[in-house]
Curated annotation (Swiss-Prot):
It comes from Methanopyrus kandleri (strain AV19 / DSM 6324 / JCM 9639 / NBRC 100938). Residues 248-271 are annotated as: Disordered. The keyword Metal-binding applies. The lineage of its organism: Archaea, Methanobacteriati, Methanobacteriota, Methanomada group, Methanopyri. This is Anthranilate phosphoribosyltransferase. It catalyses: N-(5-phospho-beta-D-ribosyl)anthranilate + diphosphate = 5-phospho-alpha-D-ribose 1-diphosphate + anthranilate. Residues 248-265 have a biased composition (Basic and acidic residues). The keyword Magnesium applies. PANTHER family: ANTHRANILATE PHOSPHORIBOSYLTRANSFERASE.
Amino acid sequence: MSVLERIIRGSDLDREEARDLMCRIVGGELSDVEVAGILVALRCKGYTSEELVGFVDGMMEHAVKVDPDVERLVDTAGTGGDELDTFNASTLAGLTAAAAGVPVAKHGNRSVTSECGSADILEALGVNIEADPDTVKRCIEEVGFGFMFAPKFHPAMKNVMPVRRKLGIRTVFNVLGPLTNPARERVTGQVIGVYSENLLDLVAGALAELGVRRGLVVYGLDGVDELSVTCENEVVYVDDGEVTDRDTVAPEDVGLDRADPKDVAGADPETSAEEARKILGGELPVDHPKVQMTAFNAGAALYVGEAVDSLEKGIQRALDVLEEGRALEVLEKVVDLSS
């Protein structure tokens, strides 16, 4: 029986089977029709954490790796594909966490649903998003922040992109993006935002199986794949390779003000970059909704990076960094070093 037939019948794949299937997909061994059928069948069946881990194994076998010499390393990423067009808080949060002393390996791509994805805004800010692995390694080691542009570090994905574009639906690859950081072997902490509440436990289980030391999988209940100041947030905790807790966190619970969705709306890359400089450089007050949402996500990064022992302490440290303009200094160094 073919893998496609098994998936259609509702059978789950084990880790090795999922790895082998992904290697065949990204290795160009299957036709576009076969790949499309498998992607649609998987989505209809639903994924398991074990399947996700196997798919990660397969993708990483074909990835270009980055191996920075740091003791701890964090990634802040979302799946994209959320329901609201918010500004890119996770990217600014990564720069803020780096300014607070936690190295960040940011893995991202261009926009999925908003006007401005992580690659779009960093490019508009002057970062060379096409930097090679050695340059990214230096950025992480010397500045504390490096960006890995997904198409450059996962070149085999070119075999899948035409099918994904033609399908025009979310597939397992939307979920795999945050789990396939090219520096994965060095990543000790991760904040992953998901586009659906149904993905929380699934992704947390995969993150635990992949052995992350500390992780948070988050979903803003108004449909945001980041920690949001506009609503309650569902948060699943991963600690030492185990899913340990699940909680609902409102902005007010961690000392932040609730905002209206329009106050954290996204914009085109040029406008977003201009605003990002103000946020990172301390030009906006600490009670500004976008400053607070950046601090919310940066606080989570500091928590998973083991720089603080609570989300609240991480948020306060992030607010201090932003008020002092130190995150903008990190950005400027990354721009210089990546060019």
